[in-house]
């Protein structure tokens, strides 16, 4: 993989222990809040628009489904260009610009009376594509030993935000109407910009100057990694099924459970919460026991099982509830593990690009799922769930050959005195098993990102000699 040298500043020393430091906690809180607010803004619309969308001029089932999923097309188009920029320039200004575009799209939707204007507004809102940039910034400000925890926390934040959005959307729409709900999305974007100020700002200097890397080369470096492509397919299938599902569910909840749109939020919340509670220990097992591949594939199989159950029994109350509960277990687990896996497997210098492609796949899935859901609205429900199950099974078959991700650890050392840091860092990086070095001259410390399985007794001794200290590795 590509090795890099980063230079960062932080407010306090970080020791080699199991706890996060203040900067890492602030980063997770701030970036998690940004993600949560943005996901709330995007997804509160999803469980209500299939019903409330009929009040717009020129609305048809297909156009309603398109309005639900079209934000995904904007995301898919702009995630990758914004990620390229974020691998070359500071990440924070790019995030601010994206959130302002998101707010503009929400305002257009709030002022719309025609379904085509809503579609345009949702497309513009989706064009504020900052998901991958936020994830890459999080990777910048967290150490490798806490990266999985941070990424899993972010994934769970996304899952919880979607869960809360599906519960809040019907309730708020009942109070504020659909245009009021769109204004809530505008407010969430503005507040998210404010949260960015509590996130530490890293100063990244890469060994391989990315300005000398063409966009085509960056793209090719990431796309040639088969396992990352399998993760792109997984997130595509996940969000295709989820967006199509929530285009279909409002009508099925009305037909099977006799619930109004406002009441449906009280069903979504406990079901999603149950899936979340069961998913958490699965995620812990994936990392602590190094069973990420097994948990990942089991979660995909669980997703399929939920859809199969819905295809067979969604016309009954028990069948509908059980099928959704099983689906949400798989959904929450996958939502949390995929970002972590991408951060572990992607080349260091192209991490934002890899996350951008993954985010594009995610939102392209949402776009296709929304359009597919609009088409399936006019079909028998058992057929709709069967189609979604078949699509997910096909994805699972392609994903099965995926290999377990690399498991790297971080070590904190004191910088030797009187060294040329550039030359010294290049010597460190030349050692097989050293993947990355992050130096903080103000604190006189550095983090080494290591693959301990590649280190030999000789390279350990050489590393100890270069650092001037005995290393417990």
For each predicted feature, which ranges?
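Juxtamembrane intracellular "pre-TM" segments in multi-pass secondary transporters
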Residues: 18-24, 201-232
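Short amphipathic helix-loop junctions that connect adjacent transmembrane helices
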Residues: 47-62, 247-263
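Conserved MFS/SLC helix-loop-helix module at the cytosolic interface between two early adjacent transmembrane helices
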Residues: 77-113
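Helix-to-loop junctions at the C-terminal end of transmembrane segments
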Residues: 79-90, 278-291
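Cytoplasmic membrane-interface "Motif A"-like loop-to-helix N-cap segments
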Residues: 88-98, 287-300
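Cytoplasmic helix-loop-helix junction between adjacent transmembrane helices
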Residues: 121-158
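Helix-loop-helix hairpin linking two adjacent transmembrane segments in secondary transporters
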Residues: 154-197, 381-382
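C-terminal membrane-cytosol helix-exit motif in multi-pass small-molecule transporters
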Residues: 187-205, 395-403
